[in-house]
Amino acid sequence: MKFSVLVFILGLVLLLALSSATEMEENARACGSFMWKCSERLPCCQEYVCSPQWKWCQNP
């Protein structure tokens, strides 16, 4: 019983890690959303501006 619960939890953690990695990879190709780190290489999306002080995307 304990082993099956452990395997279930580890499976959920693995699934979460894989989905997070995929999401980060997809977003790396796109523009920066709200509160994302921005730079010359990764500009903010059209509706956001890059904060000069904090270097993240925010509302204008």
UniProtKB/Swiss-Prot annotation:
Its main location: secreted. SUPFAM superfamilies: omega toxin-like. PROSITE patterns: HWTX_1. InterPro entries: Huwentoxin-1 (IPR011696), Huwentoxin_CS1 (IPR013140). One of its GO terms (cellular component) is extracellular region. Disulfide bonds join C31-C45, C38-C50, C44-C57. It is found in: Secreted. Keywords: Disulfide bond, Ion channel impairing toxin, Knottin, Neurotoxin, Potassium channel impairing toxin, Secreted, Signal, Toxin, Voltage-gated potassium channel impairing toxin, Voltage-gated sodium channel impairing toxin. It comes from the Eukaryota. Residues 22-29 form a propeptide. Expressed by the venom gland. It holds the Pfam family Toxin_12. The keyword Secreted applies. Inhibits sodium channels Nav1.7/SCN9A and potassium channels Kv11.1/KCNH2. Also binds the voltage-sensor domain of the potassium channel KvAP (from the archaeon Aeropyrum pernix) with very slow apparent binding kinetics and affects channel gating. Reaches its target by dynamically partitioning into anionic or zwitterionic headgroup lipid membranes. May bind to the open state of KvAP. Belongs to the neurotoxin 10 (Hwtx-1) family. 63 (VsTx1) subfamily. This is U1-theraphotoxin-Agm3a. It comes from Acanthoscurria gomesiana (Tarantula spider).
